[in-house]
């Protein structure tokens, strides 16, 4: 009898522990699905993803894991299947990604690339404006020409800091140089760097702004990131008008990713009415204007 009682007590204890564990499992439910997204640094540095992430996670019971990269690096992660979706802003690189058969069609949009927000690029620089690009109604191309001319003339007060990282912003910068009549590789990246006025940072947008500020240099930035960092910078906006400065954000589901359905949920989420309204007001209380604008078919195009 003495030997039986301890065995019974042990069995009761084991059954109690099992019931507790099973009960906890039932309460907690299954672990959330993991969705990996590579995003541009501008969307991350502005804090937009910090706002969107918890809403998306709660709505879809998902663990959203975000990696902030330049567009070029983000798309490379999409090619290898290291992420399930990318949120980027370089139409030319996006088109190449889709042409390479790395993108999956978004179910509700019947296309691989879905635009969901936009803002504008601006040229910023020191208030002293040694290249003289402000207040003259210059186009972005004309402003770049003046910066190049002054830099090439060894005006030591004129410098330009580039992202230099194959990001969407870097792509836009190269497009402006090309539109201004320059061979980017030879005239800017080569001769400009040799002359010392053109500097490639190789960093994200926030870090590039800080570097340009420290060097009292010009740079190209999306307006949202500039507004988010403006309080800690001496740089000022100098040129902010021109069709070439349009900056459209798109989301693409990666064909080599492993969570298509949840990635498609992200696409639908970003275009949902309540999220579009959130984007329209994001940053207004702090900066007096939005850091991004919601999707507009007349500006961003379809879908």
What do the predicted segments below correspond to?
Residues 30-157, 202-203:
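N-terminal segment of the mature folded domain
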């Amino acid at each position: 009898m003495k030997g039986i009682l301890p065995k019974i007590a042990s069995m009761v204890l084991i059954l109690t522990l099992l019931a507790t564990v099973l009960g906890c499992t039932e309460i907690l439910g299954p672990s959330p699905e993991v969705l990996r997204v590579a995003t541009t640094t501008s969307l991350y540095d502005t804090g937009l993803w910090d706002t969107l992430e918890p809403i998306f996670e709660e709505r879809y019971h998902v663990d959203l894991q975000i990696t902030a990269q330049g567009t070029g690096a983000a798309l490379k992660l999409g090619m290898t299947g290291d992420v399930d979706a990318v949120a980027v802003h370089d139409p030319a690189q996006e088109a190449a990604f889709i042409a390479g058969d790395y993108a999956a069609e978004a179910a509700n949009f019947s296309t691989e690339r879905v635009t969901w927000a936009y803002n504008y690029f601006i040229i910023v620089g020191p208030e002293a404006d040694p290249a003289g690009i402000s207040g003259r109604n210059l186009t972005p191309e004309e402003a770049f020409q003046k910066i190049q001319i002054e830099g090439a003339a060894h005006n030591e007060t004129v410098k330009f800091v580039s992202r230099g990282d194959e990001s969407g912003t870097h792509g836009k910068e190269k497009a402006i140089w090309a539109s201004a009549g320059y061979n980017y590789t030879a005239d800017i990246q080569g001769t400009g760097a040799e002359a010392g006025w053109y500097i490639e940072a190789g960093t994200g947008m926030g870090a590039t702004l800080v570097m340009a500020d420290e060097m009292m240099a010009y740079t190209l930035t999306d307006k949202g990131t500039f507004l988010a960092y403006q309080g800690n910078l001496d740089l000022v906006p100098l040129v902010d008008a021109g069709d070439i400065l349009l900056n459209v954000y798109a989301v693409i589901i990666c064909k080599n990713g492993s969570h298509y359905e949840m990635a498609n949920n992200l696409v639908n989420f970003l275009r949902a009415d309540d999220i579009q309204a959130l984007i329209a007001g994001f940053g207004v209380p702090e900066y007096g204007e939005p850091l991004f604008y919601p999707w507009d078919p007349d500006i961003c195009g379809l879908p």
